[in-house]
From Swiss-Prot:
Keyword Repressor recorded: no
Protein name, entry field: Transcription initiation factor IIB 2
Keyword Metal-binding: yes
Purpose of the protein: Stabilizes TBP binding to an archaeal box-A promoter. Also responsible for recruiting RNA polymerase II to the pre-initiation complex (DNA-TBP-TFIIB).
SUPFAM superfamilies, alphabetized: Cyclin-like, Zinc beta-ribbon
GO molecular function, one term: zinc ion binding
Alphabetical list of InterPro entries matching this protein: Cyclin-like_dom, Cyclin-like_sf, TFIIB, TFIIB_arc, TFIIB_CS, TFIIB_cyclin, Znf_TFIIB
CDD domains (alphabetical): CYCLIN_TFIIB_archaea_like_rpt1, CYCLIN_TFIIB_archaea_like_rpt2
Similarity comment: family membership: Belongs to the TFIIB family.
């Protein structure tokens, strides 16, 4: 039950915790099933309207909010690359070479040493990987904060920037209970999965992250959504996982494999069968793993389906 005025923590339709606040439309949306949970959220943005970026800049009375995604936290002045002045007029060609030199030196001053240069590159990489994964800005901000803490404690030494960035994203996703698999992050970043896992364990230990272990429930909505399976399949999958966990079948086994096997069974039960190959592709586990988990679950729960 949700107390009046309190923000819901789970989607009432699919029970997912992956909720996104759309401030522009005043809505709280489930990222997994698309349900609009709230539609009357008060817009805390400016009272004025702007119809293009130039008008937006002219009407704004404050700068951009502080962000961990910029090496200077967004507090420094930036010179626009649009070749327009404050009033939106184009800068004459005769002055553009001078503006280019000013802009170039300004960039050099903003990133004045190797440490700042490395941080700037790392945060740009974090932004790029985050965009490929489709994760919201608040998770990227959390990942950037984790990365900054790693830099402060000198945890980057002896490891690649890429692996620590990926590990920070993985940790941030787990922290807000919207886990992404190591396979997903590896594909988006082209960094070896084992290196990411090793870097993550290093960060978790040294930064004392204390993240709870992921469970099969964390992946079911996400996987079902990718497989175009409805709420009924999600409910059945979760019920199968619940029974499997109560019988100790999931002990010592990867949560993604258990979730994938449960979804395989559920998809057949709801009349929308998905092949083990399809499920393996979106879950990042092998067909052999799905087959083994399926056999263990079906035997323990006495489930019989026509494959």
């Amino acid at each position: 039950m949700t107390v009046e005025g309190e923000t819901p923590k789970r989607c009432p339709e699919c029970n997912s915790e992956h909720l996104i606040r759309d401030y522009e439309h005043g809505e709280l949306i489930c990222a997994d099933c698309g349900a609009v949970i709230e539609d009357a959220y008060i817009d805390q943005g400016p009272e004025w309207r702007a119809f293009d970026s130039d008008q937006d800049e002219r009407r704004a009375r404050t700068g951009s909010p502080m962000t961990y995604l910029s090496h200077d936290k967004g507090l420094a002045t930036e010179i626009s690359w649009s070749n327009k002045d404050y009033y939106g007029k184009r800068i004459p060609h005769k002055n553009r070479a001078q503006i280019y030199r000013v802009r170039k030196w300004h960039q050099r001053i903003r990133v004045s040493n190797a440490a700042e240069r490395n941080l700037s590159l790392a945060l740009q990489l974090l932004n790029d990987i985050g965009a490929k994964l489709g994760i919201p800005k608040d998770i990227k901000e959390t990942a950037a904060l984790i990365y900054r803490k790693a830099v402060e404690k000198n945890l980057i030494r002896g490891r690649s920037i890429e692996s620590i960035v990926c590990a920070s994203i993985y940790a941030a996703c787990r922290k807000v209970n919207i886990p992404r698999t190591l396979d997903e992050i590896s594909k988006a970043s082209e960094v070896n999965k084992k290196k990411i896992g090793k870097a993550y364990r290093h960060l978790a230990k040294e930064l004392d992250l204390n993240l709870k272990p992921t469970t099969p429930f964390s992946y079911i909505s996400q996987f079902c959504n990718k497989l175009d399976l409805d709420k009924q399949a999600i409910v059945i999958s979760e019920d199968i996982v619940r029974q499997a966990m109560s019988m100790g079948i999931s002990s010592g086994k990867g949560p993604t494999g258990i979730a994938a096997a449960a979804i395989y069974i559920a998809s057949v039960k709801v009349g929308k069968p998905r092949t083990q190959k399809e499920i393996a592709r979106i879950s990042g586990v092998t067909e052999v793993t799905i087959r083994n988990r399926y056999k263990e679950i079906s035997k323990a729960l006495n489930i019989s389906i026509s494959e």
